[in-house]
């Protein structure tokens, strides 16, 4: 795996990761995102349906927490999760946890990290972890780490222990890896821990960079774009080598993505469009930093604040918890005001859903609890999100990243 940076603007890095995959014949542009999956499959979608989506990332994101309990089956299969899940040619990145599912805290020890799957808790020692990676056969995988500590709410002693444990797990995994020829083509991604303590974040970053890892995961950030988190991200990326990619999980809102991109982060998960789909919502934010004057007025009226968030008191079947999580970048199609709205989800969108169906139809599917609702929303939300990353790269090439950041900022609540 080789990262080539072609341009740096306001901290944002434009480049290409080449020589990826078992055959080293694929590339991934950065800034970019990964294709989020549940147990190896894109949520709501078949692989045939996935082919209808434009701009699908070259790297697929799988999660050890959802696959560890199926290890015996995969051991019998003997050909890895890629072929088992119908993706024999996919480049796979395996993270330890599913960014969508919060993990209970207080279960990690010096010897093992706790994973949480459908069947409950699974204790993962370094030996078991490497054994699982040999069965899954990913191209990249996040090293085992004590990621329970997040910014805020942890003692200094607990934060320091998190960093110490993570470095110990990294050293043990590297030692175990050296004894397995079948894992030599795999790239190990080191995790940077440290909660909200700058000195511990920097210690974790510098010590991890001394080890032979292929990239870095900025772990323990879960969105909100708080100034404290953003300043920590800036400090960590400044301490990392420039020739290796930086990953982050849990920062998926468009405004969060741009804040992180401008602080040197390269790769993101694509959990955000999945969360939006699960709320019965559709992404409608604009990422066109050079709008067509003929359509600018239409787009402005289409994506007004009321349009995105819904009118106050709008009738909806949306649970209160879901409404609280809604962002200004989406509309809730469960609201009854869409019953007779025969426009596409987003004017100008070329996805299958917008070309063939209306807001009213998706509203009906949601009201009737039809499975097709999730399929159509996932198609639209994935494609819109993937195109957003294309706009980020184009804005960097054109020297317009500040214009794009301002456009997104104006749409954020």
From Swiss-Prot:
Disordered, as annotated region: 298-321
Membrane topology per record: Peripheral membrane protein
Gene3D superfamilies given in the database record: Queuine tRNA-ribosyltransferase-like
Keyword rRNA-binding: no
Keyword Cytoplasm (UniProt): yes
GO molecular function: metal ion binding; protein heterodimerization activity; protein homodimerization activity; tRNA binding; tRNA-guanosine(34) queuine transglycosylase activity
Subcellular location(s) per record: Cytoplasm; Mitochondrion outer membrane
Binding site for Zn(2+): 349, 351, 354, 380
Cofactor notes: Binds 1 zinc ion per subunit.
Keywords: Cytoplasm, Membrane, Metal-binding, Mitochondrion, Mitochondrion outer membrane, tRNA processing, Zinc
GO cellular component: cytoplasm; mitochondrial outer membrane; mitochondrion
InterPro entries: QTRTD1, Queuine_tRNA-ribosyltrfase, TGT-like_sf, tRNA_ribo_trans-like
HAMAP family: QTRT2
Primary role: Non-catalytic subunit of the queuine tRNA-ribosyltransferase (TGT) that catalyzes the base-exchange of a guanine (G) residue with queuine (Q) at position 34 (anticodon wobble position) in tRNAs with GU(N) anticodons (tRNA-Asp, -Asn, -His and -Tyr), resulting in the hypermodified nucleoside queuosine (7-(((4,5-cis-dihydroxy-2-cyclopenten-1-yl)amino)methyl)-7-deazaguanosine).
Stated family: Belongs to the queuine tRNA-ribosyltransferase family. QTRT2 subfamily.
Stated name of the protein: Queuine tRNA-ribosyltransferase accessory subunit 2
């Amino acid at each position: 795996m080789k990262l080539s940076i072609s341009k740096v603007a306001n901290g944002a890095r434009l480049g290409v990761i080449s020589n990826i995959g078992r055959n080293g014949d694929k590339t991934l542009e950065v800034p970019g995102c990964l294709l989020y999956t549940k147990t190896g499959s894109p949520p709501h979608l078949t692989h045939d349906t996935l082919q209808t989506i434009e701009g699908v990332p070259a790297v697929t994101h799988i999660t050890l927490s959802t696959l560890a309990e199926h290890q015996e089956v995969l051991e019998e299969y003997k050909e890895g999760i890629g072929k088992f899940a119908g993706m024999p040619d996919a480049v796979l990145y395996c993270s330890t946890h599913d960014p969508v599912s919060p993990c209970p805290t207080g279960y990690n020890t010096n010897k093992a990290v706790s994973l949480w799957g459908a069947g409950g808790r699974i204790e993962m020692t370094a030996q078991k972890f490497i054994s699982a990676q040999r069965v899954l056969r990913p191209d990249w995988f996040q090293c085992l780490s004590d990621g329970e500590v997040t910014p805020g709410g942890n003692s200094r002693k607990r934060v320091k222990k998190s960093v110490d444990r993570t470095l110990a797990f990294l050293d043990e995994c590297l030692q175990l890896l050296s004894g397995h020829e079948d894992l030599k083509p795999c790239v190990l991604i080191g995790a940077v821990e440290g909660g909200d303590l700058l000195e511990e974040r920097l210690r974790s970053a510098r010590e991890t960079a001394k080890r032979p890892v292929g990239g870095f995961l900025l772990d323990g950030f879960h969105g909100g774009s708080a100034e404290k988190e953003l300043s920590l991200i800036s400090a960590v990326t400044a301490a990392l080598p420039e020739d290796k990619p930086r990953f982050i999980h849990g920062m998926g809102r468009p405004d969060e993505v741009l804040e992180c991109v401008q602080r040197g982060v390269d790769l993101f998960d694509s959990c955000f469009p999945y969360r939006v789909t699960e709320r019965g919502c559709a992404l409608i934010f604009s990422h066109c930093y050079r709008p067509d004057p003929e359509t600018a007025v239409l787009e402005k009226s289409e994506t007004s604040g009321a349009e995105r968030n819904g009118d106050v008191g709008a009738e909806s079947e949306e649970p209160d918890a879901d409404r609280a999580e809604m962002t200004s970048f989406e509309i809730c199609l469960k609201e009854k005001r869409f019953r007779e709205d025969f426009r596409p989800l987003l004017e100008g969108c070329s996805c299958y859903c917008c070309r063939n169906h209306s807001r009213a139809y998706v509203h009906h599917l949601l009201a009737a609890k039809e499975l097709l609702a999730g399929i159509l929303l996932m198609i639209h939300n994935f494609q819109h999100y993937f195109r957003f990353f294309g706009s980020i790269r184009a804005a960097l090439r054109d020297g317009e990243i500040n214009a794009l950041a301002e456009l997104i900022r104006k749409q954020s609540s």
